């Protein structure tokens, strides 16, 4: 959409529950949300005890490999963070196990922490951002995780963790 010529006409069509934007061969259709939009700011953690900076390419490569195994187990991948590394673990009965460590920088927090995510949701954002590092921040294994990038201050992606039996305190 960044390459759209701002001088061209855009045809806008609105129905009861959809809006469409058409220009040349480009067509964008979106659903119109009825009622009051939820307060998304309530989900974004303001303070986080654990913050990590990870090289995006290394994290992406390991996460994609974990996703190959995780597809057989509801896409659940577990992450164990310590002072210098994140261990990425995926298991699937009959398919095998995956474990890989990726170097990171711990920005804040002192304890080793574990959290699990749907790897597809995490990959969606890591593949999309064009940055050298991604920042992950969360309080504990059940709190929302805030993913940010240094280059764009207003970019915030929230991913909710998955509760797993082996990652409960």
PLM regions and their residue ranges:
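DNA polymerase processivity clamps
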Residues: 1-33, 48-169
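Glycine-rich, pocket-lining loop/helix-strand segments that form or immediately flank
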Residues: 36
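Short hinge/gating elements
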Residues: 43-46
């Amino acid at each position: 959409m960044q390459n759209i010529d701002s001088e061209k006409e855009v045809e806008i069509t609105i129905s009861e529950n959809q809006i469409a934007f058409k220009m040349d061969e480009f067509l964008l259709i979106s659903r119109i949300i009825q009622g009051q939009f939820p307060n998304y700011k309530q989900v974004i953690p303001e303070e986080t005890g654990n913050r990590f900076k990870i090289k995006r390419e290394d994290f992406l490569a390991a996460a994609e490999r974990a996703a190959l195994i995780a597809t057989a187990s509801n896409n659940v991948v577990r992450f164990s963070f310590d002072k210098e590394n994140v261990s990425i673990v995926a298991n699937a009965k009959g398919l095998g196990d995956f474990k890989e460590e990726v170097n990171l920088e711990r920005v804040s927090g002192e304890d080793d922490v574990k959290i699990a995510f749907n790897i597809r949701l995490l990959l969606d954002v890591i593949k999309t951002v064009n940055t050298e590092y991604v920042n992950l921040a969360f309080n504990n294994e059940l709190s929302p995780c805030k993913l940010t990038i240094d280059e764009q201050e207003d970019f915030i992606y929230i991913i909710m963790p998955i509760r797993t039996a082996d990652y409960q305190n």
